[in-house]
Every structure is written in structure tokens, then in C-alpha cells.
Amino acid sequence: MKQLFLLLLALGSPALALAQDMRQDTYCNPLNIDYTYMIYNSDKDISYRSGADPAVVRFRGEYYMFVTRSNGYWHSKDLLDWDFIAPKDWYPQGSNAPAAHNYKDSVLYVTGDPSGSMSILYSDNPKSGEWKATPAILHNLQDPDLFIDDDGKAYMFWGSSNVYPIRGMELDKNHRFLPKGEVKELFNLDMPRHGWERFGENHSDTVLGGYIEGPWLTKHNGKYYMQYGAPGTEFNVYADGVYVADHPMGPYTYQKHNPVSYKPGGYMNGAGHGSTVQGPGGEYWHFASMALSINVNWERRLCMFPAGFDKDGIMYVDTRFGDYPRYAPAVPGKKGQFRGWMLLSYRKPVTASTAKGEFGPDALTDERTKSFWLAEANDERQWVLIDLEKPARVCAVQVNYHDYRSNLYGRIPGLRHRYVIEGSSDGETWNILVDRRSSYKDTPNDYVELEVPTTARYIRYKNIDVPTPNLAISELRVFGLGFGKAPRSPQKLALDRHTDRRDVTVRWEPVKGAQGYNVLWGIAPDKLYSSWMVYDGNELEMKSLTIDQDYYFAVEAFNENGVSLPSETKYVE
């Protein structure tokens, strides 16, 4: 590696950019895959990409990801780089809220017909795209989850409703997976007790009830962890909770730490209706859905977070800095932890070649998914310039494209994004940081880790080619480290638990030079597993608590230069 580095230095910065095709050690949510353009709103001429409800399984040492209405599925060797597989035999409209289960590395099973009536598909060679159907039909299955236990007994779980609970039944694996025994109701939402299950943005809807959906069963150390999504996929608070049992059919007990997968703050929001899988190093990873909800409510992206089970058997998912760069699953010993690169571009001045109507370039650095820059054309004359206002060490960039009247539907061959990103210290002499001029990849959420970090004050995006008739970008994010000081720890943390014990207000003294804060909380001082990112404020009202649960809170501050130590941890009864 040292010899390669010296060779690249000798060749100059354009050669450094070419090195980005080498393996990356980090990733950044949302996942950068070639999302399918949806067809189930095509009758309204609404065009958008989406990926949701990921079912990720390991099969013979590699990984397969099944995603709602994608007309196929993805394959990966490392959970980082994914290739799309167009199956030869599949559900005609694509699988909906699919399930997948690996049975002893011999057969991979999949379910998820959008009609709710379906055969279980199976394959011993999913790379080939060849599947067969069991000669039986199972009915009335919404968001199915197939699980085969170590003893060979098979179960089907399902549920997607604001009325009906998660249900389950045993199947006869040796008799065409026909139902065996009675349907059993396992559990439903309990909104009067569980604040996070309430509907609406920030759980604010007091009229409509939440939805329970997307069951996914994980077995760990003899315990069964039934994960479920709530309260609504279009909201920032979409999350996964978990119940625990000693048997697949229950009885199930609500885990004290809930929700387990929760990301209501920051750039990308939501972390619900997911699946949990063991990665290349044996660590657990949780995949889930994140909300865009611009063109339609069901416009979504996928995310991946490190997960695990602590010494007390508590399941958790780490979403702290969940849309910042993290170590990739295959990097030994890192367990997907936060890389330590900060956001350099937040609210920095932006200029652009052109802008159409109200969609100006300021949207590119506001950390809001629902705003975007729209150029007057989609040609090579379009550019964006971000002034970081002072030099910083740039380590990675992320370009999040947006669909504005794209007029594309289904799987379309040959889509590609081509662009160049340059860096400069003075605004006059430019070096290529990212070179996608010859790319044949479809990269709607392109994240690139620079092979060699560079010092720059100005970052320039130059468009070459996009697959859509309009050039629209939601966010151009620049990651790295400034040369200043990280903020000090927040002081004067105060907690006010409301009369409605599902709600709490967290306050702290503003920290000079802080860009934002992470509110951390959990059921014990050593179990602060939950995190809520807050920009430009020193107060947070949360409506996600369990009424009879005690909690511990802390707050950390961050800026372009790093992260503070957490504040003192405070207890609220």
C-alpha cells in the first residue's frame, strides 16, 4: 500500500482520483444502490425511485437483499457493494414487503406477493435468478416473514395494519408449507404505554393510530427477537421495536429498551421495517427504510446500522451519527463504528451555474431531504461551488440526486451518473477529487471516500451526465475534519418528564462553536443506545418514552472539528 501511495503521488492528483475505484473502508447512509423506479404510481405520471422494507439474508457466505417492488433483488459479498439481479421467475409486480430465509445454506426461501396470496419461492442458486414455487398458495399475508427454526419447524408471521396485530402460524415444511395449527395473535401496538408507536411526524398526531408492520424474527442465544415497524413509513420517527420470547410463537414480552432502531434527527430520517443479519465478521447489522416522501409518501431509501445484543440480552441498533461515514462491515475490528469525519458543508455558502424557480442552491447544504437544487438544464455546463469558508481536511463526499419529473419507470438499462468533483484552497487552482467522467454506474446517492484526503476550502461539482431529464440534487455533503477545536461538553442538562409520561423535554446550555448535538438516552447509564441529532438548538421535546420505564440521558456537542465528551448522565424517573 505504501508503494501504491508513492506511485499515486508521483502521478499527481488526477491519478489519485482514479484510485477511488479501489475498495472503500467506509459507507454512508442512505445506501448507494441503483434503486428501481416505481411503477405503482405510474398511472398518475409520478416518477421516483424508492427502496424499502429490506429483507437481507446471508446465504453460503454471501448476501442477498430483497426490496419492495424492485422487480428483482441485490447480491453482495461484503454488505457494501451490491449488484442487481433480474430474476427469471418472480412475482409479476415485484415482491412487496418481502421475506427471505436461509435454510441451512441449502435453499433460500422468499415470499412477498403484492396481492397477499402467494406461493413460497425457493432457489438453491439465487445468483442465477432461477426460482421455483412451492405448489401451494398461502392467503391473506401482509408483510410476511418466513422463519425456519433449528429443529426444522417452519413458521409464518405477518401484519400491516392500524387495527390488527402481528400474527403467526406454524407451517408444514414437508407438506408444501401448508398451514399447520391455528393462527395466533402475538402482539399489537400499545400506544397509551409506548410513546414511539404514536402516529405522525415527531409522534405528534393525536387522532390517527399508528401502523404495526414488517415482522422479522431473529434468534440469538436461544431467545427469539420479533422486530416490527411502527408508526408510519413516511415519518421521521419510523422505527423498529422488538418483543422477546422463548419460543417462536410466544408468549412475547416487550423489551425494556425500545424502539431499537430509531433515527428521527439529522439529514436522513427513519429506521423502520427492517431486517437483521450477521455480517462478514460475525457482527450483527440492521437494515431498514428511511423516508424521503417528496414525490409521494412512499418514496424511500435504505439504511444499514451496526446492531447487537449486550451481556443482558438487550437488542440494540447504533444510529448515532447514522448518516455520517461509518466503517464498512468488512473492516476488521471496527464493528461499523462512526469514522469520526464531520460534516464540513453544513449551511456553507453555495453558488451555482443556474437555478430554476424556487429551487436554489442553498438547499444543497441545509441537511434537509425535502429541499433540492434544480438546474435550468442537465448538461455539462452546470456546476455547483461550495465555500467551506476556511481550509479543512476533506475525506469524503456524498452526492444525493433527486427525482424531479423524471418520467422513468421500472428497471431501465444503461442509467449512469457522470460528474467531477474538484477541490481548491484559493478558488483558482483546482485538483480533481472525484472523477466519474467515465462511470457506467447508476449512483443516485453516490458516496465516495477519497483515497488520499486533501486540504481544500472550495468544493466544486461539475455535471457531465445524469439519466434524468432534469438535474436536481438534494444535498451535496462534504465530510472530513477542520483544523480547529472540538466543542466542550454541554453543561446544565435538565430533564422535564411531562404529566404524559411518554413525553420528556431535554434542555442544555448552548455550547459556543457547536454545530449540533446528539441527545443520548437509554434504560441504564451503560445502555445509552438511542440517539437524536439536533441542529441549531439546545432543546428537544421527545414523545417516544415508555410510561413505566426509568431513563438516563446525556448530550454531546459536535462541530466540524470533532465531538465533545458527553455531558454528565442524568436520571429521570
Language-model features, listed with the residues they occupy:
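Beta-rich carbohydrate-recognition and catalytic domains
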Residues: 20-207, 219-266, 281, 290-333
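Beta-strand-rich modules
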Residues: 542-563
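Short, solvent-exposed loop/turn segments in extracellular or other extracytoplasmic domains
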Residues: 380, 441-447, 533-540
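Aromatic, loop-rich ligand-recognition surfaces of beta-strand-rich domains
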Residues: 368-432, 444-489, 497, 509
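Extracellular low-complexity, O-glycosylation-prone stalks/linkers
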Residues: 513-532, 536
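Predominantly extracellular/luminal regions of secreted and cell-surface proteins
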Residues: 167-179, 334-366
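Short beta-strand elements bearing conserved aromatic residues within extracellular beta-rich modules
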Residues: 169, 419-421, 517-519
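Pro/Thr/Ser/Gly-rich low-complexity, intrinsically disordered linker/stalk tracts
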Residues: 479-513, 547, 561-573
